[in-house]
Amino acid sequence: MATQPVSTSLIRFLTAAVAESIRRASEAGQLGSLAPQQATAIAPVIQIPSDPRYGDYACPTPLGMAKLCRLAPAQIAQTLQKHLDLPDIETQVAGGGYLNFRLGDPFLAKRLQELLHLGENFGKTAIPHPERILLEFVSANPTGPLHVGHGRWAAVGSTLANLLHWTGHQVEREFYINDAGNQMRLLGQSLEVRVRQLQGEEVALPEDAYHGSYLVDIARRLLGQVKAGIRPLPTTLEEYTDFAYGEMLAWQKQTLQQLRTEFDHWFSERRLHTPDPQTGLSAIQQALQELQERGFLYKAKAPRGEDPKPGAEEAVYFKTQEFGDDKDRVVQKADGSFTYLAADIAYHRDKVQRGYHRLINILGSDHHGYIGRLKAAVGAFSPDVKLEILIGQFVKLFKTDPQTGEKTEVRMSKRTGNFVSLNDLIEDPEIGVGVDAARWFLLSSSMDSPINFDLDLAVKQTFDNPVVYVHYSHARCCTLLRRLQEEEKVELTNKVPLTEQQKLPYKEPEERALLLRLLALPDELIAAAEERAPHKIIRYAEAIAADFNKFYDNCRILPLLKEDPLLAQARIQLVQATQQVLFNVLTGILGLSAPESM
């Protein structure tokens, strides 16, 4: 994997320094009863104190070492302090065993210079053992438009992929197309009826057909192509199905691209059902054959531990209980047909065979019961491949009723017939909010929390709308920097100024607070990636905007260009750094635009 520019993670930097101090103190016999092998096993913890009086960073690790060392935490902290090698960083022992760190100005200047030098690459970090990860998300049926829930998985999945990439992993994004089974036959039947209706026939849609008016649009396109001589009118259900499938998949791809969500692979479920020309077996049959050879399948009239029901027939069961599932699962019915699980097993076997270290699936809350069986599938084929299943809650849309003035849930769409589509959320004249607002609000909560999407707030052009507030902050940086260059003829530089006393020439607390916030980007990305929590970057962007606007309001620049050039330059660089970090967060991580003027 190609190397990428590396930013300094301040938390990793301090963690390594404390770990080294523990090793040195242990070798010197100064940590009481702590054995050398115990010393190397300690993983120091670095935190950001809620009160800046306690330093920029703090380490509570001595408190946890007290029992192992049989020493007072404060004594351990004092010992570690003596072995710390941190020039330009002030260290204090406080709180009965905390190590508090305050970053010195020369150290901060180096980090700011690194930020300005790396530019669009600032925030990217490396890890000793990067993983090759397959991230599967959205994976909708190609039988209708994508709904708002799919939009949430698209926003979360694409942002998580960015986070994993920026923190050093090799990530591939995959969409599993559910294009097999009875649903595809129903899609073809529904299109055929719509075509016949447009031709003047009085024919009704079957009750279980797809009733959305989007199929009328597809039927019109089909008849238009027939009239233009591009294709003949379909004569079989298979031909109707294939046309509808192609149209729906193209629409879904277009919608996802509009939401700035790209995929590296589109995996068709049909592949799993197609016989291999060499073996004559489908991927499903090959997967079950391998499970049989590994001793994970058996025939029975009921799963192990349960009594058969009257009249039950013999089916093939997968021993999912051996991998933590609550009961064994049927993979082949008595009539010889395969269950949905059989296809899922074959699909995950295919993933395992492609050589990934880790598989991540993002699923809706209605798939919670799939966790055990999918982990069993991966575990049966390879104990070394890690599978993570992230379960997300759904989205409800709310808008003010113009008649009552109360917030009401928006449930229906004229276009789809029974739900609000992702297209509606983006571009509908009545409820559409645009791509940036859609992504922002779909990313704004942790995955395990449902989202109550306020459509009114999302289109507000005031600072109540967090998208507008963050966009405005970036645009404000750009506008000020343009003015400085074009009107004041200021030449921007990456060289950070220090006074003769090797101090940053800052005068106000807002300056240092903003700088610390900006330098935290690598650690914010690492934490969000490790916790699979893209919403944390939303909170981080809001915090940057708040800190920057406090700085902007309290720290003048233009009057200082002649009065105090050194301070003016230092403040200009904070504006440069803010613009860069917001740009990286908005475009590189969250998939939003970064307007240069508003």
UniProtKB/Swiss-Prot annotation:
Monomer. GO terms for cellular component: cytoplasm. One of its GO terms (biological process) is arginyl-tRNA aminoacylation. HAMAP family: Arg_tRNA_synth. This is Arginine--tRNA ligase. Pfam families: Arg_tRNA_synt_N, DALR_1, tRNA-synt_1d. Its EC number is 6.1.1.19. CDD domains: ArgRS_core. The keyword Secreted does not apply. Belongs to the class-I aminoacyl-tRNA synthetase family. It comes from Synechococcus sp. (strain JA-2-3B'a(2-13)). It is found in: Cytoplasm. It catalyses: tRNA(Arg) + L-arginine + ATP = L-arginyl-tRNA(Arg) + AMP + diphosphate. Disulfide bonds: none annotated. A motif ('HIGH' region) lies at residues 140-150. GO terms for molecular function: arginine-tRNA ligase activity; ATP binding. Keywords: Aminoacyl-tRNA synthetase, ATP-binding, Cytoplasm, Ligase, Nucleotide-binding, Protein biosynthesis. The lineage of its organism: Bacteria, Bacillati, Cyanobacteriota, Cyanophyceae, Synechococcales.
